Regions:
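Alpha-helical transmembrane segments of multi-pass membrane proteins predominantly involved
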Residues: 1-162, 169
Length: 169
C-alpha cells in the first residue's frame, strides 16, 4: 500500500497511462514506490527472501486449502507483476529487472535445495512452490514479450498440474 501511495503522491493518478507519461519528472521517487510494491507482491507469491510463512501455512492447512494456496494467490500476484511492470514501468526496466533476477534465482535455488530434506509432503509442496515461483519470475525478469509469454504459459501449465494433484489427493 505504501508503494501505491508513493506512486499516486508523485504522479497524482492511478491510471497506468498517466503514470507512464509522468515518469521523467519524478523517476527516482516512483522507483521507491515500485520497490515497495514489488516487496509486497514477492511476499504474496512467497518468493525468497519473503517465503518464511509458506511452509508453516501449507503444513497446518487441510490438503485442499494447501493446493489452493499453491496456485490461486500466486497466479493472481504473478498476473499483477506482469501487468504492473510491463504497462507503466517498462521504461524503468533497469530499476526493477535486477530485483526480479535476484528473486528468481534465489527462489529457484532455495526452493530446490530446501525441498530435498523434507519428510512432510505439504512442506515439500511449499518449497516446490517457492521454486516454481522462481521459474515464473525468470520470464517476467527478461522484460520482453517472449519472456512474459513464457511465464504465462508456465503459470497455465502449473494450474493444470495443480488441478491434477488436487484430483489425485
Amino acid at each position: 500500500m505504501y508503494g501505491c501511495s508513493l506512486i499516486y503522491g508523485f504522479t497524482g493518478s492511478t491510471n497506468f497511462n498517466v503514470i507512464a507519461n509522468q515518469l521523467g519528472s519524478s523517476e527516482y521517487a516512483i522507483t521507491f514506490g515500485i520497490v515497495f510494491i514489488l516487496v509486497g507482491l514477492a511476499f504474496k507469491i512467497s518468493a525468497v527472501p519473503f517465503h518464511m510463512w509458506a511452509p508453516d501455512v501449507y503444513e497446518g492447512s487441510p490438503t485442499s486449502v494447501t493446493l489452493f494456496f499453491t496456485m490461486v494467490p500466486k497466479v493472481a500476484a504473478l498476473t499483477v507483476f506482469i501487468r504492473f511492470l510491463y504497462v507503466p514501468f517498462l521504461n524503468l526496466i533497469d530499476q526493477w529487472q535486477m530485483i526480479l533476477i535476484f528473486l528468481s534465482i534465489a527462489s529457484m535455488l532455495f526452493g530446490a535445495i530446501a525441498a530435498i530434506g523434507q519428510t512432510n509432503l505439504k512442506r515439500l509442496v511449499a518449497y516446490s512452490s517457492i521454486g516454481h515461483v522462481g521459474y515464473a519470475l525468470a520470464g517476467v525478469a527478461t522484460g520482453t514479450n517472449e519472456g512474459m509469454q513464457s511465464s504465462v504459459i508456465y503459470i497455465i501449465c502449473l494450474l493444470y498440474t495443480s488441478d491434477a494433484a488436487d484430483d489425485w489427493s
